[in-house]
Amino acid sequence: MTPNDTENAARPLPEGAVDPAQDAAGAPDTLAPAAQADAVAALEAEKLDLKNKLLRALADMENLRRRTEREVADARTYAVTNFARDMLNVADNVRRALDSVPVEDRAAADGALKALLDGIELTGRDLAKTLERHGVRAVEPQGQRFDPNLHQAMFEVPNPDVANGTVVQVVQTGYVIGDRVLRPALVGVSKGGPKAAEASKPAGEAPKPAGEAPKPAGDGQKPAEA
C-alpha cells in the first residue's frame, strides 16, 4: 500500500457519499433490458426445441409400437405359409383321386370301394377345414370377373353369350392366406362376348346418334296466311 492509499483510507468521506468499494460489493447483479430480452428469447427457443424433440420421440415410439404389432400379427398369420403351400399339393392329389372316378361309378359303388371313396372325400374335407383354421382359403372364381391379382389365365374360350373376361373354367383351385395370394387360380377366360359393363347394363331405349338435334314439337313449317 502506498502512502497515498493510506492517506485516502484515513481521510473521512464527505457527508452523503458512498464508498465505491462497498457500493460495488452490495449492488445487485442486474442485466440491462436488452440483455434480459435476449436471455428470455434464448430460454424460449430452448424450450421449443426440447418440446419438438419430445414430440418427435413420442411419435417415433408410437410408430415403433404400431409397426411391432403389425409385424407380430403378420408373423402369426403367415408363419405357416411355406407349410400351407406344400399342403396344397396334398389337397390337389385328394381331389384328383375323387375326380378320377366317374360320377355314375361313384354313385353305384358299394362295399369296400364306397368306403374308400367316402374316406378320401372325408380326408379332403378335413384338410380344407384345417387349412381354413390357419387362415388359408380356397379361391373358386367360376363365373366371376377375371382378376389378375387372384387368377392366372391359361387359355381363352370363345363365347359370345358370356361377358368378355369372365372365368368360364377353373383348371386349378387358387388359395389365399390372410390378404396374400398363396397360389393363383389357373383359369380359362371367355372372349368374343359383350364387355362386362355392357353386359350388366339393363336393356332400354337405344341411344340417339350423336349430333342429332331434337325435333320441334310442331312440323316446323310456317302456317299459311289467310
Curated annotation (Swiss-Prot):
Primary localization: cytoplasm
Region annotation Disordered: where it falls in the sequence: 1-31, 189-226
GO molecular function: adenyl-nucleotide exchange factor activity; protein homodimerization activity; protein-folding chaperone binding; unfolded protein binding
Compartmental location: Cytoplasm
A GO BP entry: protein folding
InterPro entries membership: GrpE, GrpE_coiled_coil, GrpE_head
Biased composition (Low complexity): 192-218
GO cellular component, one term: cytoplasm
Keyword terms: Chaperone, Cytoplasm, Stress response
Function: Participates actively in the response to hyperosmotic and heat shock by preventing the aggregation of stress-denatured proteins, in association with DnaK and GrpE. It is the nucleotide exchange factor for DnaK and may function as a thermosensor. Unfolded proteins bind initially to DnaJ; upon interaction with the DnaJ-bound protein, DnaK hydrolyzes its bound ATP, resulting in the formation of a stable complex. GrpE releases ADP from DnaK; ATP binding to DnaK triggers the release of the substrate protein, thus completing the reaction cycle.
Family to which this protein belongs: Belongs to the GrpE family.
Quaternary structure and interacting proteins, as annotated: Homodimer.
UniProt-listed NCBIfam families: PRK14140.1, PRK14141.1
Designated name of the protein: Protein GrpE
Organism, scientific name: Methylobacterium nodulans (strain LMG 21967 / CNCM I-2342 / ORS 2060)
